[in-house]
Amino acid sequence: MCIRDRYASLIVPNMVIIRNFIEIFQAEALWIPGVSLLDGIAYDYAEKNKYLKSVHNFENDILVASRNIAKRYSSGKNHIAGTTDVALDIFDSTRKIHGMGKRERLLLQIAVLLHDCGKYISMSEVAECSYRIIMATEIIGLSTEERQVIASAVRYNTREFGCYKEINRETSMSRENYLLTAKLTAILRLANAMDRSHYQKVKALNVTLKDRILYLVVDSARDVSLELGLLKDKKEFFEEVFGIRLVMRRKGRR
């Protein structure tokens, strides 16, 4: 077998590393891919420029990684599931208004998954602790800018949303990402308020957009006075961000 000179000097160091891995993990077998770093760079370039379409669902990998982070910090699984359903219903029903796409939908899902992880550190500073956890944790598949957007949406879920100069001073966030953060925050606030008690009282939520009015009709057999009251508190910011009216009521009532 003929080995190129530029690769020959790498053989011994690689063998040492591989041997150590085998000994540390007591591996019985070792699988080595037949690709190099350059292959990965070429593939990434081709996919981003739409020269080829990936058959692997990388977004699912990102969501799995985010769920593992939420699990590590003991986030409420049922609360997250309920809040995610509501957030995605609102997102999908307002596509014509907000202009966001598939990638932004993914960022919203991750924000919901991680919005409560700060409780593991402090019950009084949940939003700030969640922000710091997200910014300190690498999530494979997300850029630093995307993590900043997610972390900021989580931070302003319960904090007053500042002006661009104020947020930019701390995060160096672009205007485009500032607007994206505002949109995700507005949706996250509404979705989180729908399960503020963490009891999953809302059986179903009918979201309809008509003539720039978003109707939220809550279906529940339980008392949802707390949730509807909190929705009114989040209404003003949502209307300001999206430029539409928000009408909320319980099913069967006018």
Question: What is each stretch, according to the model?
Answer:
Residues 4-189, 195-198, 209-212, 216, ...:
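Helical "lid/coupling" subdomains associated with nucleotide-phosphate turnover
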Residues 74-81, 239-254:
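A short, charged
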Residues 112, 218-220, 250:
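Flexible glycine-/small-residue-rich
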Residues 168-169, 201, 248, 252-253:
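C-terminal amphipathic alpha-helical interaction region
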Residues 194-246:
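Low-complexity, glycine/alanine/valine/leucine- and proline-rich hydrophobic stretches
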